[in-house]
């Protein structure tokens, strides 16, 4: 958007110095290596910003990118191998000198997927594969200048991974009955150092 470009023409200084804009960008491309192999690349980039003169600022954004390889083993079996990246972050700022501060937070994921589809016949398809996701979460970090009365704080980052395997069967028995069933097994792992707490029934910490 171009809203903030018009703010500069305002005669009111409290409006003139404000910030107001957002953007969204999508991009896609593909390349066929040969009859059995095709590469797909896609991405999304978005950002929103709001600022009130020299008082307050707030912004957030998303970035995602996907690289996918499609491979045909035969006329009945094909696979998709996907590498997916996503990042969400936001920033809050207070520009008042005596209480100035900046807050940052983000969630970043890396995802690897391997999917297969086997066509037993025109009405019977089996899908199976693996899914691995690694999470990095930065809950919050507060920074401030030396003259600010705000104390700096950094919440510990958290890292974890999910892994899953699945298989499903889609079977069109006739023109009125379509049967779909499957099985999925998943697990979650937490990595890295950090403080972890146990709580009792009253919500109080009983161990660290």
What is each model feature region?
Residues 5-9, 23-25, 80, 166:
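Surface-exposed loop/turn and secondary-structure junction residues enriched for glycine/proline
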Residues 2-19:
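Surface-exposed beta-strand-turn/loop segments characteristic
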Residues 11-12, 34, 74, 174:
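Short, structured coil/loop segments at alpha-helix boundaries
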Residues 9-10, 49, 96-97, 104, ...:
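General secondary-structure edge motif
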Residues 127-208:
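Signature of Gram-negative outer-membrane beta-barrel scaffolds
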């Amino acid at each position: 958007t171009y809203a903030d470009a018009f703010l500069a023409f305002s005669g009111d200084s409290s409006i003139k110095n404000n910030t107001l804009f957002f953007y969204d960008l999508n991009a896609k491309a593909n390349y066929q290596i040969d009859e059995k192999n095709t590469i797909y690349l896609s991405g999304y980039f978005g950002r929103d910003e709001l600022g009130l003169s020299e008082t307050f600022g707030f912004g957030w954004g998303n970035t995602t990118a996907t690289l996918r390889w499609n491979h045909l083993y035969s006329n009945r079996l094909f696979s998709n191998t996907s590498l997916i990246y996503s990042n969400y972050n936001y920033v809050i700022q207070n520009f008042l000198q005596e209480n100035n501060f900046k807050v940052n937070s983000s969630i970043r994921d890396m995802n690897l997927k391997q999917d297969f589809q086997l066509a037993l016949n025109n009405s019977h398809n089996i899908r199976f594969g693996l899914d691995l996701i690694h999470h990095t979460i930065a809950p919050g970090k507060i920074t401030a200048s030396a003259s600010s009365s705000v104390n700096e704080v950094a919440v510990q980052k958290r890292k974890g991974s999910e892994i899953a395997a699945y298989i499903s069967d889609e079977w069109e028995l006739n023109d009125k009955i379509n049967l779909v069933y499957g099985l999925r097994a998943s697990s979650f792992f937490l990595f890295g150092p950090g403080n972890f707490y146990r709580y009792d029934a009253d919500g109080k910490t009983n161990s660290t």
